[in-house]
Amino acid sequence: MAAAPPAAVSEPTAARQKLLALLGQVQTYVFQLELLRRCDPQIGLGKLAQLKLNALQVRVLRRHLRPGLEAQAAAFLTPLSVTLELLLEYAWREGERLLGHLDTFATTGDVSAFFTETMGLARPCPYHQQIRLETYGGDVRMELCFLHDVENFLKQLNYCHLTTPPSGATAALERVREFMVAAVGSGLIVPPELSDPSHPCAVCFEELCVTANQGATIARRLADRICNHVTQQAQVRLDANELRRY
């Protein structure tokens, strides 16, 4: 008996699969950038040819995909399209910046200056963005420092969007996008600097569920919780022979 032919994959599913594969490839490139900016620059110089080729491919991808991603953003946003757009923007910026700093190091040989530039030690903190939302009744100002600040700002915009000029909302959302590129553009795991200890995580909830509550509710105990699960150093046991092997 002949086997049934495989079911045809719908066009949206096929497009989603291609975007996921592309997202994984760009994420791998970004991971390489994050490693090279923290490594001995001599290692980066040894991989300069491959790095330039990857940077060129990111340029091509950004040029081809950006119009389509912008068109989709104007019609219907999805988490996948937003993540890919932010990741491509971050990969393009940081890849070009790293190449420039490697070229400078090849000329000067200054290791300290290389790390100062690649780690952004001489630049303002990218995780502090001043947001100004123009409304017909006055201006709303706030500073984005954490990811939940973005959520709070979008809630405010949703509340007062009828009194906000389109141009003012667009300008404010551009600043939000810049913050998101710096915050989550490097990957789905955000930097520890973006963790607010006053906001408990899922691990905090699990711990409070198995400890004595002394009559207090979970909500009350979560409100008094200081979370350090994101910023505390993980305890990892490594064997010296394993390090030599890999």
Curated annotation (Swiss-Prot):
One of its GO terms (biological process) is viral DNA genome packaging. Keywords: Late protein, Viral genome packaging, Viral release from host cell. The keyword Electron transport does not apply. It comes from the Viruses. Disulfide bonds: none annotated. It holds the Pfam family PRTP. This protein may affect translocation of the virus glycoproteins to membranes. It is involved in capsid maturation. Belongs to the herpesviridae PRTP family. This is Processing and transport protein. The lineage of its organism: Viruses, Duplodnaviria, Heunggongvirae, Peploviricota, Herviviricetes.
